[in-house]
């Protein structure tokens, strides 16, 4: 956990694509974070597909690192695309790996969710799906504000900068609310 003033957030992006709108949205969140908040990014793209036979032999090193990162963070930020009305396979795989006993590190963590998609819904269904997982794993998802970046191809420039001022304000508000939520539920 971070010091008494700041909140440490572990972020994970459910998209592996180099030019991903979700990766760009995560960069925007890092840029807009409140003073004193730190946001570290977990690398979840190298995990093998979850297999209990593998886990029974011990967590793979990148998964063990991820579990330690989750445990050390005050709060979590999920940034997810929407694939077939759900979160991405890479994000679900990371959650599946990290949630296994012993010492499931998600329990009690405050979490914020945001996402971007080319569709009008802006990842609303994926975020709902992810929220259900969060509740099952005893995380505490932040309810408001919601950040659904729809029609994302019109809101990022060629360099990947998020140009939508309303959306930038929502991301900023989400992070401020996450900081307040983390303090309110006693994680900080």
Question: Can you describe what each PLM-predicted range is?
Answer:
Residues 12-13, 42, 114:
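Short hydrophobic segments within beta-strands
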């Amino acid at each position: 956990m971070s010091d008494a003033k700041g909140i440490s957030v572990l972020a994970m992006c459910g998209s592996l694509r180099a030019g991903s709108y979700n990766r760009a949205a995560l960069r925007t969140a890092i840029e807009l974070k409140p003073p004193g908040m730190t946001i570290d990014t977990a690398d979840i793209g190298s995990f093998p597909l979850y297999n209990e036979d593998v886990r029974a032999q011990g967590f793979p090193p990148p998964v063990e690192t991820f579990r330690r990162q989750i445990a050390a963070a005050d709060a979590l930020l999920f940034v997810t695309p929407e694939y077939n009305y759900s979160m991405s396979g890479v994000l679900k795989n990371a959650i599946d790996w990290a949630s296994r006993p012993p010492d499931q590190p998600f329990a009690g963590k405050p979490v914020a969710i945001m996402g971007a998609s080319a569709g009008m819904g802006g990842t609303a269904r994926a975020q709902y799906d992810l929220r259900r997982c969060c509740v099952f794993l005893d995380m505490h998802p932040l309810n408001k504000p919601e950040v659904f970046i729809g029609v994302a191809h019109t809101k990022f420039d060629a360099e990947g900068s998020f140009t939508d001022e309303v959306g930038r304000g929502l991301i900023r508000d989400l992070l401020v609310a996450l900081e307040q939520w983390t303090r309110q539920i006693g994680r900080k």
